[in-house]
Amino acid sequence: MKPVIALVTARAARGLDEDEAPLAAALRAAGAEVAIADWDDPGVSWESFDLALLRSTWDYSERLSEFLAWVERVSRLTTLSNPAAVVRWNTDKHYLLELARAGVPTVCSRFLEPGADAAVGLDSFLAQLEEPELVAKPAVGAGSRDTHRYRRQSRAAALAHVRQLLDAGRSVLLQPYLGRVDEYGETALIFFAGVFDPTTGVKPGARGGASMDVLHFDHAVRKGPMLPGPRDEHANPEVGARPLFVAEHITPRTAQPDELEVAARALAAIPHEGLLYARVDLIRDAADAPVLLELELTEPSLFFGHSPGSAARLGRAVLDRARSFIL
């Protein structure tokens, strides 16, 4: 019997996910039936799939409660990857505090919650900021929407942005802008479930057969700087006025040993199991040491086009997982 796989997207992302076609082709070549389904389509019978794979559900941050309710419901009807517990944990960037407490080198992160005094919170952060620029972003967000960088002297513009987010009921994440990214870019390391890779030492990620027990490193890419130059005092925060995602400049990259080590520590600190895929986004600090910027476990782009065979490798992991649940 052919496994039936859903690649889960969003209506707004149709035609935008460059990973979708190669992954669907790889799954079909490996003997699966594949359907592309919008997560919020009421006409989809999720119980008809052996596995639903989250891919380009890029509008979730605007509808988080609705999306998480859907995740819970669908996880009772079929195998959802990544699992519901992982998605709940990963869709709010407060997880960065948990990883930092676990000893993972992480970009310094300060959160302001709705109801907080925006000016007091921002000024407290600026008083401790050593870098000349900062980044302000929503704690729940995707595609760099509503994310801007500011010079520390552009306090008024940063404060207007922070206030707009807080007034909309959104938690705010403040971080230093690490200028090394302008030259070196980000390093995105992609991991798939599969056979143990002794070069990374990543912990087991799921119960089950050998092919499901471990996340292993597959490939890496360089992501060019995503944020434009710092905004000035007269900038309109434009919260809510943005495209689905910010375009990225992607090129292949060879992951360095120190980057693999930090990625392994980040993955080992995840408090949930059952992952099929993960993307670890790192940048380098002023001392040229890699630090975690984000851990993408929900709907990351996996950049198959920059690593021949990577779609097929994830496809095999998907089918291994699906077949393990087929009676």
What are these regions (language model features)?
Residues 12, 59, 141-142, 179-180, ...:
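Short, solvent-exposed loop/turn segments at secondary-structure junctions
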Residues 255-327:
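ATP-dependent carboxylate activation and anion-phosphoryl transfer catalytic cores
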Residues 151-266, 270, 291:
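Phosphate-binding site of ATP-dependent enzymes
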Residues 1-81, 86-90, 94, 117-120:
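ATP-binding N-terminal substructure of ATP-dependent carboxylate-amine bond-forming enzymes
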Residues 49-54, 187-191, 288-301:
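A short beta-strand motif that forms the metal-chelation/ATP-contact edge
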Residues 47, 104, 129-130, 275, ...:
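Structured loop/turn residues at beta-strand edges in well-structured enzyme cores
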Residues 40-42, 175-180, 280-283:
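Short, solvent-exposed loop/turn elements at beta->coil junctions and helix N-caps
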Residues 2-9, 15, 71-76, 85-184, ...:
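Active-site nucleotide/adenylate-binding loops and adjacent lid/helix of ATP-dependent enzymes
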